[in-house]
Design a protein with these regions (language model features):
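Acidic, low-complexity, intrinsically disordered peripheral segments
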Residues: 4, 19-33, 113, 294-311, ...
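Bacterial N-terminal signal peptides
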Residues: 9-18
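Regulatory alphaC helix of protein kinase catalytic domains
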Residues: 44-70
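Small/polar, glycine/serine/threonine/aspartate-rich low-complexity segments that form flexible
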Residues: 55-59, 107-179, 183, 315-326, ...
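A glycine-/polar-enriched beta->alpha junction
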Residues: 70-79, 86-101, 138-171, 180-197, ...
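Amphipathic alpha-helical coiled-coil segments
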Residues: 80-95, 215-240, 249, 256, ...
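Periplasmic alpha-helical coiled-coil/stalk elements that build and connect Gram-negative outer-membrane
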Residues: 95, 209-333, 457, 502-503, ...
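Amphipathic alpha-helical coiled-coil scaffold segments and their short linker/junction regions
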Residues: 263, 267-268, 302-373, 377-378, ...
């Protein structure tokens, strides 16, 4: 029974890692092998993905949803923002570092020769040097747990050989096995202050995900805008071509009338100048379309591959909205925005991290009060002559027999008289929380304005479509009337050409109103945090 106390102490020490392991283990997805994906480790950037799925008859045939999906898959800006999420995950992995176990070992050999200065050195004479050789072998293990408990265990052995005849054992081996734990009781003691960096790091990951969601929403809005810009540019080109065709038809009739003598020679220049002017508009519209398509290719990632960059785009969406036009009031839209905008989630996570930092700073103001307990088992072994008999002992048998124990208990107190570093840390945390509170208020103000503007733009677009359709109908009737009067000799070519110009302007205005409505719908979705909903997409699929 004389070994019961040491064995109990060792049992408790050995059980400590098992008792604390569930708390100190990383959560799923917080391990390096989970985070270091092949994409992260690759030193090359993958080419555009998924473009081949939309290749039809030598063209890229794209719906609006297709364009959004390709943007999220291939757009460089989206991938750069996604990298911020990955970076925050590795920062979380680094927050586990204080709890990593450490195993160290040491092997050292030293030999010395020195002249004797005393007969007690046992060399047998003044002309015989003192020769000694020491070999040291050590193994140490240490680990800190989320309770703040630091556990250390070590095993060391020293092999000493010296030409001293007074030594009982020569060579002799001294071995020690030691166990020690240190538990902070105030500052950095127990779970909260040690888990706080992990909590903050996890909040930062969640905040980066919310920020990425906001960037995805912005990228979707940009992709939608560029998609409809191509549709509008293509529609504008069609309007310009129809206007040119009408002017050329009028010019041909006037030229025929001039040949027959039914038109004064000077009147032909008006219709001829209109043909030239409208041809300029067609050229301008063609190059505006090219620029819009190049911008859309950049958004889709098609510019990254020369083959796909050279393909024509075939956009399947029509600007004229089908079905009932969307309606939403400002109050409902604002309520949705406050609940679903990812920017608010990012601010909430930042404020949560601020609260944790403040609590941690208060803990750092406490004095250091540490409880330390240690146990060591010593052993001495070697070969020597005792009472004229050859004797051999084992130091390892002695240390594991626990015959020569050493017990240590210590309570240490460190009381800073000012502790300015901790006070500065607390002040910084308080200022950070105040800054984030103002950020939340500023965000709420900006979102309120964004929602109001988006709803107003939607209502304006709906009214513009109705007015544009009426204006186009009247412009067509006016063109037909002026053309009929001119054919009957009651009108002038000036009025006919002016009516054609007004009709083209009405067509252009209606097209702009229709595209404006589509953009306004996308703007409402963006303002209310619903940008992903129309396309059945989730941000989690991009940040796994």
């Amino acid at each position: 029974m004389k070994y019961s106390a040491p064995w109990l102490f060792l049992a408790l020490i050995s059980l400590t890692p098992l008792l604390l392991k569930p708390e100190s283990c990383a959560q799923n997805g917080e391990r390096y092998r989970d985070l270091a994906t092949p994409q992260v480790q690759s030193d090359k950037v993958a080419g555009p993905q998924g473009l081949g799925d939309y290749l039809v008859e030598g063209k890229l045939r794209l719906s609006l949803r297709d364009a959004v999906i390709l943007t999220l898959e291939n757009n460089s800006s989206v991938r750069i923002q996604q990298a911020q999420v990955e970076s925050s995950k590795f920062a979380l992995l680094g927050a586990h570092a204080p709890f990593d176990p450490l195993l160290t070992s040491l092997f050292n050999v030293s030999s010395s020769i020195s002249p004797p200065f005393s007969t007690l050195q046992g060399t047998g004479g003044l002309n015989i040097n003192v020769k000694s050789t020491t070999k040291v072998l050590q193994f140490n293990y240490s680990q800190t747990f989320e309770t703040g408990t630091n556990v250390q265990a070590g095993l060391s052995s020293n092999n000493n050989s010296i030409n001293n005849s007074f030594f009982l054992f020569n060579p002799y081996i001294s071995s020690t096995m030691n166990f020690q734990f240190t538990q902070p009781l105030l500052r950095n003691g127990w779970f909260f202050p040690n888990r706080a960096p992990l909590v903050i790091a996890r909040r930062n990951v969640e905040q980066s995900r919310a920020t990425f969601s906001a960037e995805v929403s912005n990228s979707i809005l940009e992709a939608v805008g560029r998609y409809w810009a191509v549709v509008e540019a293509r529609g504008s080109l069609d309007v310009a071509k129809r206007s040119l065709d009408a002017a050329e038809a009028t010019y041909k009739r006037d030229k025929r009338a001039l040949e027959l003598g039914a038109l004064p020679p000077l009147d032909i220049y008006r219709s001829e100048s209109q043909v030239a002017s409208r041809r300029v508009q067609v050229i301008q519209s063609e190059y505006a379309l090219k620029q819009a398509e190049d911008t859309l290719r950049l958004t889709l990632g098609a510019d990254q591959d020369p083959y796909f960059q050279a393909l024509d785009l075939e956009l399947t969406e029509q600007p004229d909205p089908s079905g009932e036009l969307r309606s939403i009031d400002t109050a409902t839209a604002l309520q949705q925005a406050l609940a679903k905008r990812p920017e608010f989630e990012a601010v909430r996570k930042a404020l949560s991290a601020d609260d944790t930092r403040i609590r941690l700073s208060h803990n750092h103001l406490l004095p250091e009060l540490d409880l330390t307990g240690a146990y060591a088992s010593n052993g001495l072994g070697g070969t020597g002559l005792i009472n004229g008999q050859q004797t051999s002992t084992s130091s390892l048998n002695q240390i594991f027999g626990f015959s020569y124990p050493t017990y240590t208990a210590q309570l240490s107190l460190s009381l800073p008289l000012k502790n300015r570093a901790a006070r500065a840390e607390l002040g910084t945390a308080l200022v950070g929380r105040r800054s984030d509170l103002y950020t939340e208020r500023q965000l709420r103000e900006q979102v309120t304005v964004d929602v109001s503007n988006a709803v107003h733009q939607l209502e304006q677009a709906k009214l513009s479509i109705a007015a544009g359709k009426e204006a186009l109908d009247l412009a067509k009737k006016n063109t037909a009337a002026e053309q009929r009067k001119y054919e009957l000799g009651q009108g002038t070519i000036f009025l006919v050409l002016e009516a054609q110009t007004e009709q083209a302007a009405a067509e252009q205005s209606l097209l702009q109103a229709q595209v404006g409505y589509q953009l306004a719908v996308a703007g409402v979705d963006h303002a209310t945090g619903e940008s992903l909903a129309p396309y059945q997409l989730k941000v989690e699929e991009l940040t796994r």
